[in-house]
Every structure is written in C-alpha cells, then in structure tokens.
Amino acid sequence: SSEKGKEAAIESKRYAEENNIKVALTFSDPFMVTTFKEGFLDIIGKGVDLLFCNEFEAMSFSGEDTVEKAAEKLKKYTKSMAITLGDKGALIYDHEASEFIRVEAPRVKAVDSNGAGDLFAGTFLYGINNGLSFKESGELACRAASQLVTQFGARLENEQPKLLLKEYLS
C-alpha cells in the first residue's frame, strides 16, 4: 500500500509481461481494496492473467452487490479469476474456456480462517502449473483451505499438503 511497494509491483508486472511470464494478483484483504483501489488499478494496468480475491473484495472493488455481477465486471481487469466464497467454495472464471465454474467446499467445522485465502491461491497456482484444469485446481484449493480452517494457525502441518494431493489424485 506504499508508493514504493506500488512502484515495485508495477515494475515486476512490466518485467513479467516483457518476458511472457503470466501475472497473478491477489487483492489481499477487504481493507486494501477500500483504501488502495487506485493503486490496484495502477498495478493492474491493462489487465492481469489471474486475479484472486474473496467475495467481499470482488464486490467492493467492482461496486456491485452480488458476487456474480462483480465477477462479470472484474473480467475487464483480468483474463481469469478465482473468487473464494468462504464455506460455499469458489467461483472461478476460466478465460480459455470462457466459462464460470462453481466449486463446492467440503463441509467442515471452521475454527480459524487465518491464511485460508493464501493457501487457496497457492494451491490453485500449484494445480494449474502441474497440469490440473481450473476446475480441478479449484477443487484441490477448496479442499486445502477447508482443511486449514479446521485448525488454529495459518499453515497446514508438514505432511498434510502431500496427503491432500494424494487423496485428491486417487
């Protein structure tokens, strides 16, 4: 949210684009969207390849009152997107297939949501970079985030990611 941070993000995005590297961006948290929207617009420029946000960030940034309307409006800023919906899963837009995909989250008893969005994004990126479709990546990401919210702390235990992946792929 600082001027230097914004400049670094803009320069990183420029470098990535010049070198045919895809750019993913996350809105981070609702406070950032409300206080740093102009900065995000500067960073986004002509658009990013993949945007991560939650439903509240999507609606706040777009000015829309439903996540579906917000997602349509966000297509102006990104090729593809993944909008997390808490215990309702995620709404994903796959630019190449030109389709929205709803992914359900496993039903769990949540005790701490700290880090769930970050884990969702990291797992989703892992999936699409390892041959999974957007739908499969979203399913895996929802499973990982759902597992995380059942415990205190922002990280899964050491073996949990491997077990989740093995379970998903079997």
Regions found by a protein language model. Give the residues of each.
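Ribokinase/PfkB-type carbohydrate-kinase core domain
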Residues: 1-102, 132, 161, 169
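Conserved post-catalytic alpha-helical subdomain immediately downstream of the catalytic base
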Residues: 83, 87, 104-169
